[in-house]
Structure formats: C-alpha cells, structure tokens
C-alpha cells in the first residue's frame, strides 16, 4: 500500500547520494542502520512507544548515529521519525537497492536449489538470464532442501519453477481431480 511512498523517499535519498558520489556508502550505512534497528529490542521499543515524543526519538537517533553515518543519512532518518515512517526503513532500503540496480542496468535473480550450483552452471545461468533480460544479472543463491530437486528462478515478477516439489504437487492435483 505504501510502496509508492517508500519509493519516493528512497528516490530522494538516492538522488542526494548521487549528487555527493556516495551511493555505495549510503546503501551500506542504511543496511547497517536497518540491521541495528531490527536486532535491537530496545530501539524498537523506543520507536513504538507512544509516550516517547518525536523530539526525544530524534535525540536518541542523533546520539546513536551521529558519528556512524553520513549527516545526510542522519537527516533522512530524522525526517522518517518526524513523519512516523522510521519503522518502515527496511522498505526504503529495498526500494533504494532497486533504484541502484535500475540505474546500473542490473537485475536481481533469486535462485533456489538443493545443492549449490557448480561454477559452470552459475556462469551459464547468468549468461542466459543476461541475454533474456538484456541486463547484468546479480545472482542471489539460496539452498532450500524443501524443493527436493531442480531449480527455482525468480527475476522480478517472472518465475521459472522447475522444482521436483512443484511437479509432485501438480501430479497430486491431477490425480485428485480424476477421482
């Protein structure tokens, strides 16, 4: 529902990062802040606490991140606190990563297999996907024993499911329909 808003925030920060030639640094800093928030129960409690006012939350964030992140990132975080959107920072990070990929003619391909791909298989998959999408492919591999065998590929909204688990489910459905 708020994807459009997340994208606008991310685009604004991305443009600032580009102007300052710090896109990689901003992405790295934002990931670090997201991880800190996600892994700190205390920070989450503070951010969600209705009796801690916005000014105090901003002070806490300034104390926490002043010397750890670029001033523009800190300003961005403070705006998100002001607009009550800081709990959705991870969504802004994901949108900023998408923008980075788009601007650099790259696309993310999520691959699931039971065992790791061999180097040759990985290279061939990257080449074929690169030709299909006419972009540089960033491969994200995941080992998933539940697929039993085969490969699952997701590129954007496109899915190629060549897994044994899906084939077995399809066979089961066909058998149940015939009964």
Curated annotation (Swiss-Prot):
PANTHER family in the record:
ATP SYNTHASE DELTA CHAIN
Annotated Gene Ontology cellular components are: plasma membrane; proton-transporting ATP synthase complex
> Which SUPFAM superfamilies does this chain map to?
N-terminal domain of the delta subunit of the F1F0-ATP synthase, V-type ATPase subunit E-like
First-listed, main subcellular location of the protein, grouped into a coarse class: membrane
The GO biological-process annotations, alphabetized, read as:
proton motive force-driven ATP synthesis
- Does the record carry Acyltransferase as a key word? no
Protein's UniProt keywords contain Iron-sulfur: no
What is stated as this protein's family in its record?
Answer: Belongs to the ATPase delta chain family.
Q: Which keywords appear in this protein's UniProt record, sorted alphabetically?
A: ATP synthesis, Cell membrane, CF(1), Hydrogen ion transport, Ion transport, Membrane, Transport
Membrane topology reported for the UniProt record: Peripheral membrane protein
Mind telling me which HAMAP family this protein's record contains?
ATP_synth_delta_bact
Localization terms from the record: Cell membrane
Spell out the subunit comment.
F-type ATPases have 2 components, F(1) - the catalytic core - and F(0) - the membrane proton channel. F(1) has five subunits: alpha(3), beta(3), gamma(1), delta(1), epsilon(1). F(0) has three main subunits: a(1), b(2) and c(10-14). The alpha and beta chains form an alternating ring which encloses part of the gamma chain. F(1) is attached to F(0) by a central stalk formed by the gamma and epsilon chains, while a peripheral stalk is formed by the delta and b chains.
One Pfam family here: OSCP
What's the name of the protein?
ATP synthase subunit delta
Q: Which GO terms describe its molecular function?
A: proton-transporting ATP synthase activity, rotational mechanism
Q: Name the job this protein performs.
A: F(1)F(0) ATP synthase produces ATP from ADP in the presence of a proton or sodium gradient. F-type ATPases consist of two structural domains, F(1) containing the extramembraneous catalytic core and F(0) containing the membrane proton channel, linked together by a central stalk and a peripheral stalk. During catalysis, ATP synthesis in the catalytic domain of F(1) is coupled via a rotary mechanism of the central stalk subunits to proton translocation.
């Amino acid at each position: 529902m708020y994807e459009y808003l997340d994208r606008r925030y991310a685009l604004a920060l991305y443009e600032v990062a580009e102007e300052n030639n710090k896109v990689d640094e901003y992405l790295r800093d934002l990931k670090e802040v997201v991880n800190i928030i996600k892994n700190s129960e205390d920070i989450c409690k503070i951010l969600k606490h209705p009796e801690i006012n916005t000014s105090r939350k901003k002070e806490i964030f300034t104390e926490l991140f002043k010397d750890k992140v670029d001033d523009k990132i800190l300003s961005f975080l403070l705006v998100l606190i002001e607009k009550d959107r800081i709990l959705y920072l991870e969504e802004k990070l994901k949108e900023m990563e998408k923008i980075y990929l788009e601007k650099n003619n790259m696309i993310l391909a999520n691959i699931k297999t039971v065992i790791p791909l061999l180097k040759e298989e990985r290279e061939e998959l990257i080449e074929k996907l690169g030709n299909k999408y006419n972009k540089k492919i960033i491969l994200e591999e995941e080992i998933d024993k539940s697929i039993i065998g085969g490969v699952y590929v997701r590129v954007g909204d496109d899915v190629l499911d060549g897994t044994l688990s899906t084939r077995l489910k399809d066979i089961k459905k066909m058998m149940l329909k015939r009964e």
